[in-house]
Amino acid sequence: MQLISAKIDGQTCMPTIKNGLLTVEVPNAPFIWEAEVEISPETNTALEGLYMSGGMYCTQCEAEGFRKITFYPDRPDVMACFTVRIESKLPVLLSNGNPSAQGEGWVEWHDPWPKPAYLFALVAGNLVNHADRFTTQSGNNVDLNIWVRPGDEDKCSFGMEALKASMRWDEEEYHREYDLEIFNIVAVDDFNMGAMENKGLNIFNSSCVLASPETSTDSNFERIEAIIAHEYFHNWTGNRITCRDWFQLCLKEGLTVFRDSQFTADRRSASVKRINDVINLRGRQFREDN
């Protein structure tokens, strides 16, 4: 990442950069920080920050990937409302929150809810969507989209039904309604996490959201349902209510895993789910006991 220019309250400043850390003198009062940087997503092979996957731009910012996009105090306790403008010739341009304005070759997204930088997301590419709509208990209509590469549209139906079931279950069991006008899922082949709960724009490894009866097993379907539920449940346990620091990671993840386990138990067999959870704990959490 290369710093092109920096300003504080509109005045050019000269920060020092050492070992990737930027230091600059700041006023003793609130101020506006502006930075213009240059990055190279095409050569970003770490798959962290903003990178390119098969002609599509996408992001992965948990835990500290946002600092590879721009200079920012990307700690989970630093929360802000984001407005993002994307300019590109690519047909689909997505980010967090709700679309607020658009024109030829550009779109703006605004997320009204303060969030830490690890939940920032951006996707740009040649994608097609499987669309649906969900009506919350209070009567708000939410547009739902699963974005995929052309040719994968026929593998989205199960994932969409799992998403709607997760939204309804969270309303009925925890009284938590979705809080934006749109919810997007993007399937990415080269994604180094199973899935990521970015606010309003979940990014999934394709294997965790796409399925068809011809090529997927029963366990594939159950896994996809559980992962979609887990990432959606993070909207409240992790996104709106986040952790103070990364030593508290177990709080947001532990609570959300508990919630997705409850969801699977309600949707399928509670006894079988409990047995599988114990097998998983013994095999992964307590390997020394095997």
Which residues does each PLM region occupy?
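Acidic/His-enriched low-complexity segments
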Residues: 1-182, 207
